[in-house]
Curated annotation (Swiss-Prot):
Record GO terms (molecular function): rRNA binding; structural constituent of ribosome
Taxonomic lineage: Bacteria, Pseudomonadati, Pseudomonadota, Alphaproteobacteria, Hyphomicrobiales
One cellular-component annotation, GO: small ribosomal subunit
Keywords: Ribonucleoprotein, Ribosomal protein, RNA-binding, rRNA-binding
Chain's role: With S4 and S12 plays an important role in translational accuracy.
Domain text: The N-terminal domain interacts with the head of the 30S subunit; the C-terminal domain interacts with the body and contacts protein S4. The interaction surface between S4 and S5 is involved in control of translational fidelity.
Name this polypeptide is given: Small ribosomal subunit protein uS5
PANTHER family with a match to the protein in the record: MITOCHONDRIAL RIBOSOMAL PROTEIN S5
Organism: Methylobacterium sp. (strain 4-46)
């Protein structure tokens, strides 16, 4: 009975692991100075996502690279966040985030734009399942700061449902305002 339960848990864990895409962002060789000299190890930064709106990042350290990557992947799966995507492909609104001296600005983009972002930010967007986004990083280009700043920005992003609940409005009222505000829409052309 217990053996059967253990096998079932392992199957569920393996099934859960297959739904995630992991991207290795950065590997760093680190040294610890000891009495006999230096001990070398590795630090890995990994981003994990299901390409449906969930994403997380993790940092792992070990004496060997594969072990550091495994630890980082496990840490990333423990810290997943959910990101609300518009039409399953982009952000609902422009948003900025920062961590330390790293700053990022994320902008929603029209369909067909693609992911216009550099380095570590691209790994986050691919893992979360975004297809159209424009991102700019300012300040520090340290991958750890950029990843954390990107996650800060993604946490600040709200879905229309959350904004409507906060303002005490209906979602349809918000979306009507959005259509009125979009340049080139039929309603705004009639008003001009």
């Amino acid at each position: 009975m217990a053996r059967e339960r253990e096998g079932r848990r392992r199957d569920e864990r393996e099934e859960r692991d297959t739904e995630f895409v992991d991207r290795l962002v950065h590997i760093n060789r680190v040294a610890k100075v000891v009495k006999g000299g230096r001990r070398f190890g590795f630090a890995a930064l990994v981003v994990v996502g299901d390409q449906k709106g969930r994403v997380g990042f993790g940092h792992g350290k070990a004496r060997e690279v594969p072990e550091a990557i495994r630890k980082a992947t496990e840490a990333a799966k423990r810290g997943l966040i959910r990101v609300a995507l518009r039409e399953g492909r982009t952000l609902h609104h422009d948003v900025a985030g920062r961590h330390g001296s790293g700053k990022v600005i994320l902008r929603a983009a029209p369909q067909g734009t693609g992911i216009i972002a550099g380095g570590p930010m691209r790994a986050v967007f691919e893992s979360v399942g975004m297809q159209d986004v424009v991102a700019k990083s300012l300040g520090s280009s340290n991958p750890y700061n950029l990843i954390r700043a990107t996650f800060d920005a993604l946490k600040r992003e709200d879905s229309p449902r959350a904004v409507a609940a906060r303002r005490g409005l209906k979602v349809s009222a918000l979306q009507a305002r959005r259509r009125d505000a979009e340049p080139g829409s039929a309603d705004s052309a009639d008003a001009a």
